[in-house]
Curated annotation (Swiss-Prot):
GO terms for cellular component: cytoplasm; Ino80 complex; nucleus. This is Ubiquitin carboxyl-terminal hydrolase. InterPro entries: Papain-like_cys_pep_sf, Peptidase_C12_UCH, Peptidase_C12_UCH_sf, Ubiquitinyl_hydrolase_UCH37, UCH_C. The active site is at C82 (nucleophile), H163 (proton donor).
Amino acid sequence: MSWLPVESDPGIFTEIIQQMQVKGVQVEELYSLDFNSLDEIRPVYGLILLYKWRPEEKENRVVITEPNPNFFFASQIINNACATQAILSVLMNSSSIDIGSELSELKQFAKEFPPELKGLAINNNEAIRAAHNTFARPDPSSIMEDEELAAAKNLDEDDDVYHYISYLPVDGILYELDGLKEGPISLGQCLGEPEGIEWLRMVQPVVQEQIDRYSQNEIRFSLLAVVKNRKEMYVAELKEYQRKRERVLQQLGALQADKYAEKSSYEALDRELSEVNIGIETVSQKIVMEEEKSKNWKKENMRRKHNYVPFLFNFLKILADKKKLKPLIAKHHP
């Protein structure tokens, strides 16, 4: 079974990750690279830049052809799999992510492989391919005649080709991972923890330079972030606020029983309780927003999984049989 093209969408990629049994991770689309935007979505495991591919000039930067054996770099073997492979590059190289049994076994199996064989190992992994193909665009070839299929293939040849590059810190080094290159590219030593802000400060100008270059050439692009599951984070934060609230209430109760307690102590605890209540309200709203977003993603993903092509094909065929199709086309395209 081949790898089929999928739409670039954070909801799709999040569900693909979940189907690969990876826990506690989701994908978000970034609309700004300013530090406040990056800081708000931490921890960020990796950034993925999507752009319309064009032949580039010769690479002058040093490509690491023999990376650390624990570093997972795979050559891009199948074009339609490049989005999933870019996500895998982040997942496989992030020690703080629970990648599940399927990816763990693949990582161990391909550990000593060169990049080309790692790419083939991904290509031949049925579980990953099945998760990817769940969101494949409907294939009209199953209902088309030979002439129609040939025409469709000719149209497909003119389709835009999109490419993905991953950026992430590994063992104190910031890397750029491009499956079309021979190996990873080191962008320099990166201080701080992988889940901190330091590597994001370092990668920001690198990605911004790429985006500016694409913008000048009118090349379409988008930026994705592989991040910790937001709802799980907020639920943990809410529980911490609730525990803090209980402690403050207990302290207030103890003060009420102490007739020698100072007024300033009451006031300090009241302020703290007020801050905690505001925190609880804020985090609760964030949880609701994440639940709503997840619900919308699931709704959209169900719509994407449905194949509307047979219905549309038969509908147009009925119109043609009744001699109504050509008049409609002529009316809207005189």
